[in-house]
């Protein structure tokens, strides 16, 4: 790639959590950062912090549930900065509830956001990434590999992300573009505090073991490193790697462990 100061990275879901921390990490490395999510006021705060530190940031609000918004975002990036070197499809959310409770509306919303939105983000970025031998980062989850009681729709969506990543790794052979699928374990996020209608509930407790949850800045560093190294598939957090290993070799034990673990509320 060229000098990092000439390179442009576009991050969806950049207003909070992992996306926000990745924005700071790419900016620290000298990349121009394009920030997208639905929450413009939070994006402006992230952009302001990046600029205050001497970096370059561009805010382009975008709802990944709308294809035209994604297409327009890419057009704005090229109009403003003339190129695109990295796209990180990070935007997403969780829909909670057991299989008996989830409605068609719940399933459609989950898959449209975490699967279709991600795929369409890549679709419109690809023509420009091919011009720069660029990089794609898809944010999945260790849930792609595991049973997911009360999170079946979410787990299915992340399994689809894993499949999309594998497909892209074949389709992009010879193009110079790499695709890294990132599967984090527990990382600090708002996901358990947002209900199935997208309403935030700050009072909701996080059922995940607090001693296993990584801070977002730690996660961002290893994710950016994996993308830069053009890794194909990257599972991280120590417990995440252990869970995936157990599921592969001792699935009965993993089912038992998960059955005894706290479940998120719907």
Regions inferred by a protein language model and the residue ranges of each:
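Active-site helix of classical SDR
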Residues: 122, 157
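SDR active-site lid
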Residues: 174-238
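Conserved glycine-rich Rossmann-like NAD(P)H-binding loop of the short-chain dehydrogenase/reductase
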Residues: 29-46
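The beta1-alpha1 cofactor-binding region of Rossmann-like NAD(H)/NADP(H)-dependent oxidoreductases
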Residues: 61-72, 104
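Residue(s) in the substrate-gating loop at a strand-loop-helix junction
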Residues: 141
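Substrate-binding pocket helix/loop in short-chain dehydrogenase/reductase
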Residues: 98-99, 103-108
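Conserved glycine-rich cofactor-binding loop
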Residues: 15-16
